[in-house]
Amino acid sequence: MRCIVLAAGMGVRMNSKYAKVTHTVCGKPMIRWILDTVLNLLDKVCVVVGHDADSVKKLLPENVEVVHQSQQLGTGHAVMSARNFIDPADNLLILYGDMPLITEGTIQKIINSHNLSNCDATVVSVEMNDPTGYGRIVRDKSGKFVKIVEESEASNREKAIVEVNTGVYIFNGRKLLEVLPMINCKNKKGEYYLTDVFAFLERVNIYKSERSCEFIGINNRIQLAQAEKFRRQWILEELMIKGVTIVDPETTYIDADVKIGRDSIIYPMSFIHGDTKIGEDCIIGPMTRIIDSYIGDRVTIVRSECKGARIMSDVSVGPFSRLREGTVLCNGVKIGNFVEIKNSEIDQNTKAQHLTYLGDAVVGKSVNIGAGTITCNFDGKRKNQTVIEDEVFIGSNTALVAPVKVEKGAFVAAGSTINRNVPAWSLAIARARQEIKLNWVIDKRKKEED
């Protein structure tokens, strides 16, 4: 069996400059949801592109064929554009690219139903409480297929039908090639409707699915949000079945490609996106955002943001920390409140607990970074590196003016501005000497009174 995915539409009701199928559901473009599902079952897949074709093509895997529909003149015209892909000796599955919820199991059931029916085509239908916008399935008194009528062409009686066409079909390839030239665009929209081919087919099977949620088509941002909610629920349920605790699924947002180990706990208002992997026995949240990051085992991240970071095991982050791209935290590191780290590697058992900025830094093992420490990494033209070797103690309110190195075991006194390298096991003090003027306040007040 072959498959054509229709992805040429502009999606006017999305009110977007981007092709409809490029919009994401749980971090994955709609077109990739449908293709990843289909390619698990079939290896011959063609995608029909049109509006914003280049953007759509960038999202397609290499093992699919691409056909360009130069004018968007309806679903029938889209299939005509791909007629060279249709094999008369093979069946053809047709799907829309804006159906990100359809599952592999449902597609397999549709295929099985068609194979058992010995019919020219199979139409997939569902019942909807509100069928507005969908073509209606018209049956005869015995329940057999009569026709599909598009809503714009339907009578009031036909509009009252709640069994709708999902836009998913299987055709006998030879039959479809025979009847495609018979359809025309003599209708209110001036389009070639693929549904018109059924008037020329004698044997049509109907597969009525009980899972209407899988066939939600995305035509506007409201439906996009509805699809996101369904898919998010399925993602969270799968994680919970695999041993992850989701404290409040209603306020937890996890993308499709995220991996989380068992016995980890995800607290409310956590947003975990992109290519993120979280190990076992972790505590994430509440109010935490993680993007494209690796997190080892037994890591705690509270009220913080991580993007493009690598965090090894037994690390504590937060609250109110920000880990930016290029951050690496090795085993046992502790990052506390209001700490920002960018493009820096922090070695084992080092602590930066309060009010710190580390940018473009290499920090060794068992280092203590005092509150208020900053690396002055930008000189106005380029970023410079700060190196802090093992067992260094950096006192509070220290400014490290890069490029600079603090060698092993050195101490930097609180309040210092360090702009020269500090030798190993040395004490660096770079601040003005304190001066005390006894009774200065009393003398000042006396002068003011005179």
Curated annotation (Swiss-Prot):
Pfam families listed in its UniProt record: Hexapep, NTP_transf_3
SUPFAM superfamilies the UniProt entry points to: Nucleotide-diphospho-sugar transferases, Trimeric LpxA-like enzymes
Recorded superkingdom: Bacteria
PROSITE patterns per UniProt: HEXAPEP_TRANSFERASES
CDD domains according to UniProt: GT2_GlmU_N_bac (cd02540), LbH_GlmU_C (cd03353)
Subunit structure: Homotrimer.
Alphabetical list of NCBIfam families matching this protein: glmU (TIGR01173), PRK14354.1 (NF010934), PRK14357.1 (NF010937)
Entry function: Catalyzes the last two sequential reactions in the de novo biosynthetic pathway for UDP-N-acetylglucosamine (UDP-GlcNAc). The C-terminal domain catalyzes the transfer of acetyl group from acetyl coenzyme A to glucosamine-1-phosphate (GlcN-1-P) to produce N-acetylglucosamine-1-phosphate (GlcNAc-1-P), which is converted into UDP-GlcNAc by the transfer of uridine 5-monophosphate (from uridine 5-triphosphate), a reaction catalyzed by the N-terminal domain.
Name of the protein in its database record: Bifunctional protein GlmU
Organism: Pseudothermotoga lettingae (strain ATCC BAA-301 / DSM 14385 / NBRC 107922 / TMO) (Thermotoga lettingae)
Gene: glmU
